[in-house]
Amino acid sequence: MSLQSLLSTKIVRATSIADAAFDAVVLVGSQDNVQQFGAIQQVSAIAPAVNNFLKLHSGAFNSTSLVQVDSSVVPSGRLILSGTGNVSRDYDDVRRYQAAARKGISMALSAGVKSPLLITLPNSRFPNAELVAALGALTPVYTPLNVREEENKQKLNQLGLLAIGNSDTSARLEKLVEAYDASFTVCRDVGEAGPERMAPPRVAEYIQGAFANGNIKVTVVDDQSVILKDFPLMAAVNRAANCVKEHQARLIRLEYVGEGETQDTFFVVGKGVTIDTGGCDLKTGGHMFGMCRDKYGSAVVGGFFKAIDVLKPKNIKAVGYMCMVRNSIGSHAYTCDEVITSRSGKRIHIYNTDAEGRLTMLDPLTLAKEEALNAKNPHLFTVATLTGHEVLSYGYYAAIMDNGPAKASGWARRVQNVGDEFGQPIEISRLHPEDFAFHMAECEQADLRQGNTKPSVATLRGHQTPAAFLQMASRIDEHGTNSSHPLKYSHIDMGGCSGDHPSVSFPNPLVTLVAGLVLPHV
């Protein structure tokens, strides 16, 4: 697929509000910006219209309004003023710009606008406000994959971006918005689509198409005998689904090698459960609804690599694994009480088939660990919609858990700051000895127990213990700070941070991962 085919709409770099190519101006700002209008060359012409409107509606910067302006200033005669509300309090953050832009474009769509021009007034407290606003503006413009495939149309003809700054600022904004929008499309297409449209084989087909003729090497493991031999726990989760050819498992490997000498190597493993029935520990009472998004960890991996594909960062190598399975229930389903030997040689005692995510990722993570031992400055990641406990703990925020070497590097703190700056905050959870002790086997048959028989929301430290399990079961724990070969590892439990099904998601923590890992090399 071409870059343009993955964009929600055509992104255009604008130079003036007087450009007749646009049929509305969407202005995002706060009350604090009122005094700045005259001093900002790009928007000074509409200052009188905004000031006059404020005399009629003093709360305009706390809401979204359609304002008629003179066509000699804005050719379309339409100005959509979308206020952020108060952004001066300690707890206000840059996401107010994201929300305001989303509301502004939503109003533009309802007004029949096809080519809006987005302008975000600067705020020294939030240097990334223009980018964050643009990503918010594109959210209602996204068209779901199945609709695009059937109707082949977009909601807008184009979205103009008028950056407040010089030409370099404008060019960088356009480049980043295109990269993020394409990555969002890949993420949403995979993460939101239903379990048949994005069954494991069709995810593989989609990813191969999305990265065709690009900078990412895509390899798909589709031989079920190979998956059974090399990734036995992943195979166990998909055992019931394997009886249906269209539902058979796929392991998708993505690889990027940037220009120049490699300084950092990232291994990112994503959970890709296309529908989570719970397996034999069946989800009942409507709790299965929305479980098509249990593949969103893999979706974030796909989006992360699309951003890399577009931005072409230098001096890094990145390897991704999208672990695509379907946790079905049936005569051949895996069950509790099984003891399965993992790729690492650790024997795993199964307690709960609805804790399948950690099993799905474990063997590919072990493979990534094996590769990392020969890589330059490696950092391993798992990304998953893993536990309800994380949702109860942090709401719509992802949680990151570092092992010893990653913690010593200060990575979680750094990426937390990056998330704040780019409007996608992330929380830090810490691991303690009891998290590791919890997963020690209770019988001689096994080395480790997968979990317990309770849901995570009824388990103490229910989102921290899986990170300990993944370390022990992959033997990453043998590469701690005091070992001869330390390996950095960070587990990210996304919980429900991308939003509520079936609303359009906002890929999370994709913005933060790209900003923290990729942008420093661009």
Curated annotation (Swiss-Prot):
Q: InterPro entries annotated for this entry?
A: Leucine_aapep/pepB, Peptidase_M17_C
Q: What is this protein called?
A: Putative aminopeptidase W07G4.4
Cofactor(s) of this protein: Zn(2+)
* Alphabetical GO biological process terms: proteolysis
The EC designation for this entry is 3.4.11.-
Q: Where does Zn(2+) 2 bind?
A: 271, 276, 294, 356
Annotated residues that bind Zn(2+) 1 are located at 276, 354, 356
Query: Do you know which CDD domains this protein is assigned to?
Result: Peptidase_M17
**Similarity section:** Belongs to the peptidase M17 family.
Annotated keywords: Aminopeptidase, Hydrolase, Metal-binding, Protease, Zinc
Q: Which residues are catalytic?
A: 283, 358
One Pfam family this chain carries?
A: Peptidase_M17
Q: Name one GO molecular function term.
A: peptidase activity
Instruction: Provide the cofactor note recorded for this chain's UniProt entry.
Output: Binds 2 Zn(2+) ions per subunit.
Recorded GO CC terms: cytoplasm
